[in-house]
Amino acid sequence: WYSDNDYAFGFPIPNGAIILPDPGDLSQSYVIYCFAEDDVRVGTFTVFKWLSAKIKHHKDDTFDLIYKDIPFGAENVEFQYPIKAVRHANGRDWWLYSFIRNTESYQLTLLDPTGLHDKGLVNPGLHIPNGAGLATISPQGNYLAIGFAIWGNDDQHVFFFDIDRCSGALAFKDSFSLATQLWPGFGFSASEKFLYTSSEYNYLWQFDMDANDIGASRVLVGEYDGF
């Protein structure tokens, strides 16, 4: 049905899928992905639910599909784009996070050897803006950074959370705003001391995660020179 007037978007959401090993059988994996629809209200796509599939890997690099398109967690709400996962403190299981747009809640899901378990909607003590963005988890799993490009606003609002990998809980740590392009990504240093992000399609900034005011700690470490 593809034509000049109909475009096959596929899965159009940044950070909209993740693959995790099955904690009960390492020859299998879970694929977590979004169900998104074009939303004329905001001129882009909105995620209304998350789905799961499970695959069995073979030694010849082929795989079998065990199941697909199984919903989990809340449905018919408006999710922010990112879904992120961090390993449980037990070293085996996984916590999954997906934020609910324009609310004070995120969806918490546990993946253990018996499957995916909805742990409900959790209030991190912070209103989640009505926008879209990207997120990342630090290498050692201690922090989550998420940025929101607010509809009709040129600023990127960046929020930091401490992660309790035993309970899966997020605790608000700090936030700042940055004039930027739409949806820049984030990267942590291996030590988790520094966070990096870009602005205005030209500048690369470094932030000190140990600072009392993370936003005020920014240092320009790179600038686009046209190659």
Model region roles, listed by residue range:
Residues W1-P12, D39-F48, I100-T103, W151-Q156, ...:
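Short, solvent-exposed loop/turn segments at conserved positions within beta-propeller repeat blades
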Residues G10-G16, P23-Y30, A36, V47-L51, ...:
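First exposed extracellular module after export/assembly in secreted or surface-exposed proteins
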Residues C34-R101, N123-I128:
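Asp-box/WD-like beta-propeller blade repeats and closely related beta-sheet repeat scaffolds
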